[in-house]
Design a protein with these regions (language model features):
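S-adenosyl-L-methionine-dependent methyltransferase catalytic core, i.e., the SAM/SAH-binding region
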Residues: 1-204
Length: 204
């Protein structure tokens, strides 16, 4: 998982199943790699990195994290290597998310939480990057929407009621005291919503 320590390019949460990061680097096309780094890592230099990976893998497959870090360092402009954070951070994040299908897991976890919450129960979610936070934000917003009919309809025809009420009008970020105690919380974002007494779609 780490770009700071040389290790096998696996990244699977469950080593018994699924493709490894090395498999993705070997099998995905240059375009698919660039899309992956851009979508899941929000990597500015996704195309350059994907091109460099494909060029290098024709000579030798990627097996170790140090090899990938070296490729990334040589693929991006020199000033970007000394910006905030490690230059390989976003690519490693993208690979980890893809290998473990993490965003799907977030979506499924939110749906499961909604099903088991009783009226008045609260769902508090801490995410650590913008992709997760976006999913949480949209999920809570959609659950809090009382009607999904087109705005030009004169009356509501869907009969939908809001199943959640958003408690945090804005995302909650850690304060200075929290960061002093726990510097790793710097990227965390908290959102909270409360279950209403409206039935879910399957129960209506």
């Amino acid at each position: 998982f780490s770009y700071a320590v040389d290790a096998p390019l696996d990244m699977r949460m469950d080593p018994r199943e699924g493709a490894t990061a090395a498999d993705l680097l070997a099998d995905l096309s240059e375009r698919d790699l660039a899309d992956l780094f851009s979508r899941y890592g929000e990597e500015r230099y996704s195309r350059q990195i994907a091109r460099a990976i494909c060029r290098r893998r024709t000579k030798q497959p990627y097996e170790r994290s140090a090899d990938l870090v070296d490729t990334i360092r040589h693929a991006i402009p020199t000033p970007a290597q000394f910006g905030s954070g490690h230059p390989a951070k976003r690519v490693f994040q993208a690979l980890r998310i893809a290998v473990n299908d993490e965003l799907t897991m977030v979506e499924e976890g939110l749906e499961a939480a909604l099903r088991i919450l009783k009226p008045g129960g609260r769902l508090a979610v801490i995410s650590f990057h913008s992709l997760e936070d976006r999913i949480v934000k949209e999920f809570m917003r959609d659950c809090a929407a009382p009607c999904v009919c087109p705005p030009d309809l004169p009356i509501c025809g869907c009969g939908r009621a809001a199943t959640m009420r958003v408690i945090t009008s804005r995302v909650v970020r850690p304060g200075a005291a929290e960061l002093d105690r726990n510097p790793r919380a710097a990227s965390s974002r908290l959102r909270v919503a409360e279950r209403t007494d409206a039935p879910l779609g399957d129960d209506a």
